[in-house]
């Protein structure tokens, strides 16, 4: 007897279903594998990838001794790669632009690369760390990509991150000093709106919402 066997698709991804053997020569032999961990059909050599432990195995095809002929064996190898899985998260989002660095929480397969869209986010491609001060305020989608390898396709995990511009403002009363007969002294404000106005020491009549001062009272 004589035979050859091979798994021409090796390496296989663990999610690829079934790996079938290419066999030539004498039929009727049995298949076995070492080390333990490979789910293989002893009669036809089919390998169930999803229930096999990722790794490299030696598969042996054995034809029993018969008709005066000695036992015959031939071998081949098969490699199974675990399907990469990963999640990413920016737990502190939204961040203020003056908060330094935003770090990512990543689980699963390491070694991927980080990208972001749209443009404007300063992100470290290797670590996923975001430099907030040099990033434009807005909301971004960050993608963590594990490249295709070992028969497995590329895997992409995504997360969102939002950055708010730090509050900043200046105020001035351009007409100061005012005469006590003036009834309305408006404030000149630049920067972030929506704040409230107050004064010290006590004695100034000021509108907390607009900042307008009434010197006459």
Please provide the spans of the model-predicted regions:
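Low-complexity/repetitive intrinsically disordered segments
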Residues: 1-16, 21-28, 190-194, 202, ...
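A short beta-strand segment in extracellular, disulfide-stabilized domains
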Residues: 16-25, 99-108, 181-191
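A short beta-strand micro-motif common to beta-rich folds, especially ectodomain repeats
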Residues: 55-65, 138-148
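Proline-enriched interdomain boundary motifs that mark the N-terminal boundary
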Residues: 1-8, 83-91, 166-174
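Surface-exposed, short loops/turns at beta-strand junctions within beta-sandwich domains
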Residues: 51-55, 134-138, 215-217
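Interdomain boundary/hinge segments at the C-termini of tandem beta-sandwich modules
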Residues: 76-82, 159-165
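Low-complexity "stalk/linker" and mucin-like segments enriched in Ser/Thr/Pro/Ala/Gly
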Residues: 14, 30-44, 48, 111-131, ...
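Short, exposed coil/turn segments at beta-strand boundaries within extracellular/luminal domains
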Residues: 13, 66-73, 96, 149-156, ...
